[in-house]
């Protein structure tokens, strides 16, 4: 009797139609190993089956792009024979179930994506979304995630230099943990994943394989329910000290000519890495499962192929290089095993105890995997479904100062010192600007150059209008990178959405990608890598089912001379304060409206991409000419919040020469900056706002603003 029953198929996350495709691909019934392999390779996490046709519309090339999407990470040319290599990944579901390990292994996985390509990691970033602070589980989740990110990054010796953290009830039952790593490599020492060379040895290196993480990729492609906590065994366990050894061993071997191809074992472990390598090399692959280093007794081929144990890599070596490579990995106290070879069959064949336990043509697993053009509402129909209330009238504030105190103290704007003090941001001694500025800035060791990095997304905008929200997420990273004086070069993304089988959710995906694509084209700012995380919704809590659409963007820019870098802090008494980009008018979907009036109403602000580019290039020009002493983009909370953040950073107040309406004070119109110059300097096209000096902003003492800004995390974590 067959062991592949309809229940077994369903438990593997395959639809009846997909199972029929498996039968057609094999010309027979699969065994359990083969079914498991199809299951993980056809999961959303590995196949992008619901998003791939839309991802293909994104701009991915530019003269400085060396490698776009499709490899482990994106690669851009930063001059002088050097490249920046970077990517962003999600670890959402594991982090909700087991926050410390989920977040830690998210960091470990994205580090491997980057050093797999030959780069030494120089910076980690993150984008975190949590539910309401008063949700009974949220404090535990925040503490665990932050400790996991800090614990792993600090031990590996890669600085965590910034990120963003937001709170909203839509994430009560499904938090988001998106991790980003940036590395630097020589352009002539970049490694790819295409397995080539008939008979070349396939080598397993790193940690041993255990039973942790089995079906992690499938779990990441499913909704949450009340039983999700039972999936704790499928959360992987990370060991950052082993990862550090793995980085050093890989980079040492990469300095030789031994490696033909290399791939980390991430989602779907040995299955995904071997399939991707063989597919990219248009080859076949045969593996001897008896040779896989195992941590536990009696592991089956099914378990070995689907395990997501951490800190493991797969390589193809040149013939005769095995002994040299093994000596390097043994020196670093890591496992090393030749477990197979490259073939020309176009099949994945697995042997175990003398028998063939798997024989699958590679085409159906990868290039010919299911591809869905799922029904999506039009933007107009989506807005009708979302039913966001019109803005209507917003009463004029009777006390701008009191509103500012409340706003600067809300969870989304509160000082994040409690978070970033747990991250080692200075390891490596090249961090020039960290959390609290517009973008993190990391010097490229031994040069005058620096990379600027920013992660951004405003999910409330994306819910109200996913097209404008997608545009805005890209534009804000561009703006933040311009604000420190760097030229924005490329982005990575982490597309977090709910169930794509719902037309309204599919509309969010399609429209956000359309907006992102338009912004990238207008700003000459291509997408070079990314990740899609779907089914981010939970039936397990009362906090609403689907998350807000959250297309998190990670931007990277280049500064040729880091001496010109600007920061947000007010510098000298008497400096002139200027507004670039016009007065605020837009209160729809603003943080002010939500925090002061308890409303999430109105349209998202629109982004005029031509204005965005013009203003950003103008600010960069002024920075390069040495005319600006401080720069800050205007985003959440509008002008008064931006001024307050500059005042708190520089410990100097400001006096304003203009009367502020509520919309001018707190409106979130896009493409705007606050900048300061020396007294007497005139900025053409900018509006003079006032002067740096004193101890107040909007009539409120800096001490009161600082206390309000620092109270939330301090009181929450001590309470």
Curated annotation (Swiss-Prot):
Cellular component per GO, a single term: cytoplasm
Keywords from the named record: ATP-binding, Cytoplasm, Ligase, Magnesium, Metal-binding, Nucleotide-binding, Purine biosynthesis
Subunit organization: Monomer. Part of the FGAM synthase complex composed of 1 PurL, 1 PurQ and 2 PurS subunits.
Residues binding substrate: 90-93, 112, 236, 308-310, 533
Position of the signal peptide: none
Record family assignment: Belongs to the FGAMS family.
List of residues binding Mg(2+) 2: 113, 264
Major enzyme class: ligase
Known function: Part of the phosphoribosylformylglycinamidine synthase complex involved in the purines biosynthetic pathway. Catalyzes the ATP-dependent conversion of formylglycinamide ribonucleotide (FGAR) and glutamine to yield formylglycinamidine ribonucleotide (FGAM) and glutamate. The FGAM synthase complex is composed of three subunits. PurQ produces an ammonia molecule by converting glutamine to glutamate. PurL transfers the ammonia molecule to FGAR to form FGAM in an ATP-dependent manner.
Catalytic residues as annotated in Swiss-Prot or TrEMBL: 45, 91 (proton acceptor)
Keyword Magnesium part of the UniProt annotation: yes
Lineage: Bacteria, Pseudomonadati, Pseudomonadota, Alphaproteobacteria, Sphingomonadales
Any one biological process term the GO annotation gives: 'de novo' IMP biosynthetic process
Catalytic activity: N(2)-formyl-N(1)-(5-phospho-beta-D-ribosyl)glycinamide + L-glutamine + ATP + H2O = 2-formamido-N(1)-(5-O-phospho-beta-D-ribosyl)acetamidine + L-glutamate + ADP + phosphate + H(+)
Pathway named in the protein's UniProt entry: Purine metabolism; IMP biosynthesis via de novo pathway; 5-amino-1-(5-phospho-D-ribosyl)imidazole from N(2)-formyl-N(1)-(5-phospho-D-ribosyl)glycinamide: step 1/2
Single Gene Ontology MF annotation: ATP binding
Natural source organism: Novosphingobium aromaticivorans (strain ATCC 700278 / DSM 12444 / CCUG 56034 / CIP 105152 / NBRC 16084 / F199)
EC code(s) of this entry: 6.3.5.3
This protein's encoding gene: purL
Subcellular location: Cytoplasm
Residues where Mg(2+) 1 binds: 89, 531
Binding sites annotated in the UniProt record for ATP: 48, 87, 493, 530
Protein's name in the database: Phosphoribosylformylglycinamidine synthase subunit PurL
SUPFAM superfamilies linked to this entry: PurM C-terminal domain-like, PurM N-terminal domain-like
């Amino acid at each position: 009797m067959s062991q592949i029953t309809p229940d077994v198929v369903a438990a593997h996350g395959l639809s009846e139609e997909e199972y029929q495709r498996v039968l057609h691909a094999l010309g027979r019934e699969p065994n359990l190993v083969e079914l498991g392999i199809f299951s993980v390779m056809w999961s959303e996490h590995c196949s992008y089956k619901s998003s791939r046709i839309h991802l293909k519309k994104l701009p991915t090339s530019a003269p400085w792009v060396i490698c776009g999407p499709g490899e482990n990470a994106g690669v851009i040319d930063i001059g002088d024979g050097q490249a920046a290599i970077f990517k962003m990944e999600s670890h959402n579901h594991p982090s909700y179930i087991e926050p410390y390990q989920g977040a830690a292994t998210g960091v470990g996985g994205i580090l491997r994506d980057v050093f797999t390509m030959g780069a030494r990691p120089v910076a980690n970033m993150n984008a975190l979304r949590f539910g309401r602070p008063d949700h009974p589980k949220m404090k535990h989740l925040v503490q665990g995630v932050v400790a996991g990110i800090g614990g792993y990054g600090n031990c590996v010796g890669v600085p965590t230099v910034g990120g963003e953290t937001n709170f909203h009830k839509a994430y009560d039952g499904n938090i988001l943990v998106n991790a980003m790593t940036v590395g630097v490599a020589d352009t002539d020492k970049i490694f790819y994943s295409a397995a080539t060379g008939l008979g070349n040895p396939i080598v397993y290196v790193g940690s041993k394989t255990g039973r942790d993480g089995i079906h992690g990729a499938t779990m990441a492609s499913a909704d949450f329910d009340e039983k999700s906590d039972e999936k704790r065994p499928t959360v992987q366990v990370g060991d950052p000290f082993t990862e550090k050894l793995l980085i050093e061993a890989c980079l040492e071997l990469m300095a030789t000519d031994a490696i033909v191809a290399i791939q980390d074992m991430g989602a779907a472990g040995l299955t995904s890495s071997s399939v991707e390598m063989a597919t990219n090399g248009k080859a076949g692959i045969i593996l001897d499962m008896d040779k896989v280093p195992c941590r536990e007794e009696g592991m089956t081929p099914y378990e070995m192929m689907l395990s997501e144990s951490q800190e493991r890599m797969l390589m193809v070596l040149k013939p005769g290089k095995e002994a040299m490579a093994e000596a390097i990995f043994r020196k670093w106290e890591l496992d090393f095993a030749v477990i197979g070879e490259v073939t020309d069959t176009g099949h994945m064949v697995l042997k175990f105890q003398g028998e063939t336990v798997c024989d699958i043509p590679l085409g159906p697993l990868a290039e010919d995997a299911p591809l869905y053009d799922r029904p999506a509402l039009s933007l107009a129909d989506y807005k009708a479904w979302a039913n966001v209330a019109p803005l209507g009238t917003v009463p004029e504030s009777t006390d701008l100062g009191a509103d500012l105190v409340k706003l600067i103290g809300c969870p989304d704007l509160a000082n994040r010192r409690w978070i970033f003090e747990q991250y080692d941001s200075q390891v490596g001694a090249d961090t020039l600007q960290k959390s609290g500025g517009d973008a993190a800035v990391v010097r490229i060791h031994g040069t005058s150059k620096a990379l600027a990095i920013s992660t951004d997304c405003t999910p409330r905008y994306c819910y109200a209008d996913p097209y404008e929200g997608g545009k805005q997420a890209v534009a804000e990273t561009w703006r933040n990178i311009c604000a420190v004086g760097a030229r924005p070069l490329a982005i990575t993304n982490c597309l977090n959405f709910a169930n794509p089988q719902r037309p309204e959710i599919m509309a969010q995906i399609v429209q956000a990608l359309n907006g992102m694509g338009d912004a990238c084209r207008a700003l000459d700012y291509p997408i070079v890598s990314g990740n899609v995380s779907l089914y981010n919704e939970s039936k397990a809590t009362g906090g609403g089912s689907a998350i807000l659409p959250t297309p998190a963007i990670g931007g990277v820019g280049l500064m040729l001379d880091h001496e010109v870098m600007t920061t947000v802090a007010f510098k000298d008494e008497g400096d002139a304060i200027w507004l670039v980009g016009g007065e605020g008018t837009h209160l729809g979907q603003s943080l002010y409206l939500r925090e002061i009036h308890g409303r999430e109403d109105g349209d998202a602000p629109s982004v005029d991409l031509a204005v965005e580019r013009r203003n950003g290039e103008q600010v960069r020009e002024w920075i390069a000419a040495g005319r600006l002493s401080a720069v800050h983009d205007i985003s959440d909370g509008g002008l008064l919040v931006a001024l307050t953040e500059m005042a708190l950073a520089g410990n100097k107040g400001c006096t304003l020469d203009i009367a502020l309406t509520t919309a001018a004070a707190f409106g979130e119109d896009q493409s705007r900056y606050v900048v300061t110059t020396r007294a007497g300097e005139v900025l053409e096209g900018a509006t003079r706002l006032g002067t740096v000096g004193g101890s107040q902003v909007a009539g409120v003492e800096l001490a009161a603003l600082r206390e309000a800004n620092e109270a939330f995390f301090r009181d929450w974590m001590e309470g």
